[in-house]
């Protein structure tokens, strides 16, 4: 098969990004809570519009943050010496601030179906390659036709604002780069112009420098946003909240109704008396209509009595709306949203009271299963990132079989964890591996703890202190 030109790859990648832009924007709006508001008739006043804005709550954002907050890389294991783990952690992970930036591909993977991380060598710091999250809005990765899981080429686009020398007006210039397995090609386009080549060169990685985080990829390589199935449920909750706010604003109190009473004042002949201005002219309202004179029956009070003329006048109350019905429906919809998203309902509703450890673990079992699935997919993606980083550092990437060490994000008792670790050490379990089970432990921390333990074991002061404490206890 003839090689496909980089211009063809460029056009194909940009076309795919343009086609996916509407879906990307919709997913981003729902995640940020900026999606369409509940329906209201045309011409409603500001009070209705204010309630319409209040009705929207970012439930979908909570369903994304719940699993993402449990995804934390604490280190890497390799088949080589332990110092390789430390080098990867310091020169790749911490050097690129991935401790905080790692959540970006996780969020993009859940919201848009794919997160993207790029790897590139640094000219001045060869042993510390650049690893950076990318937006799936601007990066497209093409795969082999017979292997939808191995990248074949990629396209990245971005924009810059430029100003010609001596000019005040700025212009937006588009840039793009095409990566193949062997080369890269840079392009540039000014407003109203065509894509023109800028530069090209060899792809030193020998691979596409983009790694995708795809939690819902199928056998055809298709990706699916994990929040898109929640859109109808989000709109239903917003609509019920809008109805609740309307009922609370306009019918959440008892209303008095008077029948058989005409407040319009009339003269002896039965003619309507009209309000007049000080100059004797008729008083007109904003629409230009004259206003009648109304009788005031008085203001109600504890020590007051209202009297209405007319034998047929009746006064009674209308009951207030029962807002608990709205609350019940909203709670049901939120529970369904939680079930679909595999997020415990107590995360969204706050209904927790006196739960034991076993009951809490059972309540969070669905979320724990979701997080474990995400760790498998995202862990494989990070392993590929580390391999590319090794190549960018001058290695081959083939001998670095890394394994991601995930932090334990489940709710557990620290005392129980320590008790279990102590028992493992007592039966001969390696201390380094046991220390790695402590919540928040990283490769650097474990190395530091091991060194401290060795220093204390070699210190006569510590030995004498332990003997003294033992004698006092005896």
Predicted features and spans:
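Extended amphipathic alpha-helical segments with heptad-repeat/coiled-coil character used for oligomerization
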Residues: 393-427
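Extended, charged amphipathic alpha-helical segments
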Residues: 198-362, 404, 409, 413-415
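Extended, regular secondary-structure scaffolds
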Residues: 111, 116-224
